[in-house]
Each structure stands twice: as structure tokens, then as C-alpha cells.
């Protein structure tokens, strides 16, 4: 999901810490899932019309990732105490070649956050279960979405109603400026976000065969690539989503829209075990976690804490 994770973290540019941080991420990477911008040596605007059999995209793509964020206190949370978080996500896609290096990907994505402490204002879980409709580019190694549509249910706790349905859309075309520099420009559209339409863009710069700078939101990184199977990087990450809250005794949070986000930085290792199987491990520091009831208030932020993450990606050819 990766991708998928996600992102969905569009926010009105207001004079607040959260707004400034999101604007900074947007300017630096300003790239919501615009990963087409770094499709290796192949230009997005110059696809191969008849790729060789060895270079065709996979028939199926799977991704499983899990992570743990150590406990930290949330401001203005009363006696909530130190709150830890578990998160996991599963994505499965069936890939259909349209023409050249362009594919239609259809599948499902399930993501869930579980929290060690909760109350009426802070749910014990956040869940999304969505269909995946993607128009993507195959670089020879990975798929990079140009258009992503994710119809599904996004809810807190176990409260699922007709108001839990959402339809986030992301449009992120890419362009080749030089053999080593790609840029993207597009937008994210989500009625559960504020603003509903948010501009996005960014770049990927291949410095040389060993170093790469990817200003790609939501996971920018500076990478060292000693060989074709190994990548070591220093990077950031912004993740989260918007969810429909269930009934509470507080009019500010009762059936309200909750936007949850995390900002963090860490060191990661991505290793290709064999063609089609990648394992990625990351450890770092979560700068803050934010609970934002975007249309009714309140906004609550956590203190920082360590986190660890493990991703497994499988492509079946």
C-alpha cells in the first residue's frame, strides 16, 4: 500500500504547526504517491511499446507491512497515560497490461492501527478496507501509480455506517527533465480531507550509480546503493488517513471526521532476496502523532517516541 501507504494527509495551509509541517513536506517532496517520477532510466513519456517477455510486469503484487511505535503521552489527554501503537497493512493487486509499460491494477487494501490506551476522544483502533483501482507505469522493477482510486470504508473502533464510505483519488503524472532527473505534478482529492483538493508534486534525482535523492512524499529518502540488491537510506515518512468516528458523548467528536497522522524519520535497509521478493526494515523516531477532528476540533499531539517497521513485497510473474 504502500504505499499507500498512504496519503491522504491533505490539510488546509493555516498558521499552525501541523499546517506548516505539511506545507514543508509538500514543498520538499510535495509528492503524494507520485513515485512514477523515479522510474529508473526509462522516461515516463517514452514507454516501450513492445517490452520483452523478460521485462513484463508481474501478474500479481502483494505487500505486507507491520510496525510498532513505542508509548508516548498525548497532550491534553487527561489520565490516558502513555499510548503505544501497532499498525499493519495488507495489499493484493492483480495487474493487467494495457499497452507498452502501462498497466491497470485491481485489488484490495486493508490497514489497521491499534492503540494500547483509548477513551471517548482517542479511539482504540482506526481501520480502512478499500478497493484499489490503479493506472500504473512499470519501470522494469516496480509499478508506479499515475492514477489511484481507493473506494472503501474508513472508520474508528468497530463503528461502520454508510457515512464511513470514502473515495480518495490521487493523480500523479511524471515527466523526464534530464536522464537523471524526473518531476511529477498532480493533486489529491478527498472529501474527508481539508482542503478537499490538494496540489502535489516533487522530484527524483539520480546523483550517480551509488547515490540517489528522492524527494517523494510521503517517504522522501537519501539512498546509498552499493549493488543492485541492496539500498541503505536515511529518510522521512508522513502517514495516516481520515476516518469517520463513531458515536461518543462529546458533540465535538460524535460521528465526526478524524484525521490521524504521524511524522517521523529513520534509517532503513531494503534488500532484494530474489527477483520479485523484497524485504525492508526501518528504525527511527516518531516526531509526533496527531489526532485532528478537522471540522469540529479538537487537535491533540503526542510526544516523540521510537518506532520499528518491517515490509515484505512479493511480485508473482
Show where each model-derived region lies.
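Membrane-embedded beta-strand positions of outer-membrane beta-barrel proteins
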Residues: 62-66, 104-108, 147-149, 185, ...
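Transmembrane beta-strands of outer-membrane beta-barrel pores
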Residues: 66-74, 108-116, 151-157, 187-193, ...
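Hydrophobic, lipid-facing positions within transmembrane beta-strands of outer-membrane proteins
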Residues: 86-92, 127-133, 149-153, 165-171, ...
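Residue-level signature of outer-membrane beta-barrel architecture
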Residues: 94-96, 135-137, 175, 189, ...
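Repeated loop/turn-to-beta-strand initiation elements of outer-membrane beta-barrel proteins
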Residues: 98-104, 141-145, 180-185, 210-213, ...
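Outer-membrane beta-barrel translocator/channel fold
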Residues: 112-120, 218-272, 276-299
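Outer-membrane beta-barrel "beta-signal"
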Residues: 201-205, 210, 269-272, 302-317
Amino acid at each position: 500500500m504502500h504505499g499507500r501507504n498512504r496519503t491522504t494527509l491533505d490539510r488546509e495551509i493555516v498558521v499552525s504547526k501541523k499546517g506548516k509541517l505539511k506545507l514543508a513536506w509538500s514543498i520538499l517532496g510535495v509528492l503524494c504517491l507520485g513515485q512514477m517520477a523515479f522510474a529508473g532510466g526509462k522516461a515516463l513519456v517514452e514507454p516501450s511499446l513492445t517490452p520483452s517477455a523478460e521485462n513484463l510486469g508481474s501478474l500479481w503484487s502483494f505487500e505486507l507491512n507491520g510496525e510498532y511505535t513505542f508509548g508516548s503521552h498525548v497532550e491534553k489527554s487527561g489520565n490516558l497515560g502513555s499510548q503505544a501503537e501497532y499498525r499493519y497493512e495488507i495489499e493484493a493487486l492483480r495487474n493487467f497490461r494495457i499497452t507498452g509499460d502501462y498497466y491497470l491494477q485491481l485489488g484490495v487494501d486493508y490497514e489497521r492501527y491499534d492503540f494500547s490506551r483509548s477513551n471517548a476522544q482517542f479511539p482504540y483502533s482506526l481501520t480502512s478496507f478499500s478497493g484499489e483501482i490503479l493506472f500504473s507505469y512499470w519501470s522494469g522493477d516496480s509499478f508506479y501509480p499515475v492514477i489511484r482510486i481507493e473506494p472503501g470504508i474508513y472508520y474508528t473502533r468497530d463503528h461502520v455506517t454508510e457515512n464511513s464510505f470514502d473515495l480518495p483519488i490521487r493523480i500523479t503524472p511524471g515527466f523526464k527533465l534530464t536522464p537523471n532527473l524526473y518531476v511529477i505534478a498532480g493533486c489529491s482529492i478527498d472529501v474527508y480531507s481539508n482542503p478537499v483538493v490538494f496540489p502535489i508534486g516533487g522530484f527524483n534525482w539520480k546523483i550517480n550509480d551509488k547515490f540517489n535523492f528522492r524527494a517523494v512524499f510521503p517517504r522522501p529518502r537519501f539512498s546509498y546503493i552499493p549493488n543492485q540488491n541492496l539500498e541503505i537510506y536515511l529518510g522521512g515518512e508522513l502517514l495516516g488517513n481520515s476516518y469517520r468516528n463513531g458515536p461518543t458523548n462529546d458533540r465535538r467528536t460524535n460521528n465526526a471526521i478524524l484525521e490521524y497522522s504521524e511524522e517521523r524519520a529513520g534509517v532503513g535497509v531494503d534488500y532484494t532476496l530474489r527477483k520479485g521478493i523484497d524485504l525492508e526494515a526501518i528504525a527511527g523516531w516518531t516526531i509526533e502523532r496527531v489526532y485532528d477532528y478537522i471540522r469540529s476540533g479538537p487537535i491533540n499531539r503526542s510526544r516523540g517516541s521510537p518506532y520499528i517497521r518491517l515490509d515484505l513485497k512479493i511480485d508473482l510473474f
